[in-house]
């Protein structure tokens, strides 16, 4: 695991894109043409633990499927922005609603629609297989590819740095 070169004690909120970050960058389609997503169980556990431990969490994605909304809502994520055509607008809405400052936010994105959000937050994270333009501006490039544990990688590092990883909420769903 590589280490993040940022003061992780500042992070109070995690925001993730879905396609290419929390799910692989390939999307299988049902016979009806409905996109389906695969998600990483360890990412889910880390997201849930972060929620239970008091961190702010949000999803900002261009996609819009009930399965994605339901999955992340069940993990405890309240702020889910679907069909986000201009992601920086949703980041600003999230900050206005929650009061988080840019330097308190970690955002992970993988492609050009994430560019402006990644420039606006304190800690920008890219999966190992992100677009070159995104890797160029990311403050941390995970050793994990999209859908293979990016969220777990960064949440675990932040929570360990803050002494909240192995807390009493860590031993159950």
What residues fall within each predicted segment?
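Mg2+-dependent phosphoryl-transfer enzymes with acidic/Ser/Thr/Gly-rich catalytic loops
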Residues: 36, 79-80, 88-173
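Asp-based phosphoryl-transfer active-site loop
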Residues: 9-27, 118, 151
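Short secondary-structure boundary segments
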Residues: 18, 62-63, 84, 128-130
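A positional/architectural concept
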Residues: 22-53, 62
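Substrate-recognition element of Asp-dependent hydrolases with the DxDx(T/V) motif
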Residues: 47-71, 81-82
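Non-catalytic pre-domain segments flanking phosphatase-related domains
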Residues: 1-18, 161-173
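Short coil/turn segments at beta-strand junctions that form active-site/ligand-binding loops
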Residues: 10-12, 55, 103-104
């Amino acid at each position: 695991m590589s280490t993040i070169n940022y003061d992780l004690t500042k992070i109070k909120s995690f925001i993730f894109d879905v396609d290419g970050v929390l799910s692989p960058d390939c999307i299988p389609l049902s016979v009806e043409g409905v996109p389906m997503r695969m998600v990483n169980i360890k990412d889910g556990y880390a997201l849930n633990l972060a929620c239970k431990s008091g961190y702010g969490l949000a999803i900002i994605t261009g996609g819009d499927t009930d399965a994605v909304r339901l999955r992340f809502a069940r993990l405890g994520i309240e702020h889910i922005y679907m069909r986000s055509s201009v992601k920086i607008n949703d980041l600003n809405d999230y900050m206005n609603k929650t009061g988080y400052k840019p330097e308190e936010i970690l955002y992970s994105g993988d492609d050009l629609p994430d560019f402006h959000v990644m420039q606006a937050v304190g800690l920008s994270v890219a999966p190992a297989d992100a677009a070159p333009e995104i890797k160029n501006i990311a403050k941390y490039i995970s050793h994990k590819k999209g859908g293979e544990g990016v969220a777990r990688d960064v949440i675990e590092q932040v929570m360990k740095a803050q002494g909240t990883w192995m807390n009493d909420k860590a031993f159950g769903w």
